[in-house]
Amino acid sequence: MAFIKTIRAREASGAAHDMYKRQEEHWGYVPNYAKVFSHRPEVMARWGRLLAEIRRPADDRRFELVTFVVARELKHSACSLAHGKQLAGIIGKDNVIAIAEGQEPDVLTAAEVTIMHFARDITRDARKITRGRVEELTKIHGLSEEEVFDIAAIASARVFFTKMLDSLGVEPDNAFMSMDLEFREKVGKGRPISHMRPEFTRDEAA
């Protein structure tokens, strides 16, 4: 469900249908977030290319950490759960829950803790970021300026995506109900998970 009308998966044609098919091939169903892009499928295509390029220089651990921190700060359930799950595969479920609760688990390096706070502050109010904050990353923790750019880009891109989806009332997919209950409740602090069954571009899921 969303606040605007969207094209149902089995009724889509042209570019919208092609976009749905690509999403379905990745997720196994057409995710709710894709449906609001049915009005502008070219935006989804360009967003996908932009995100891929932003992600390319970073390793999975850093990308998922920054993305999760931003999504959790914005209380976006779907992105928090999706990227929290990915991050849990790298650092463990309990550590992801700890981060969600504002802790700094020992599994994180000192640099990663600083990166985490940097990403949170970008999300809260980027105007308050000072040169000193950037120099803490470069001079104390040894990050390159290119790496600082990458972190800022990853965080800012997630702000765009989550705010767009929440502003249009996009509900997290029902598929998230299959996740561990404790993880779901402690990590997914945002819009409630949809009760609607997933849609497919064909009559039945393969």
Regions found by a protein language model. Give the residues of each.
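Hydrophobic alpha-helical segments
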Residues: M1-A206
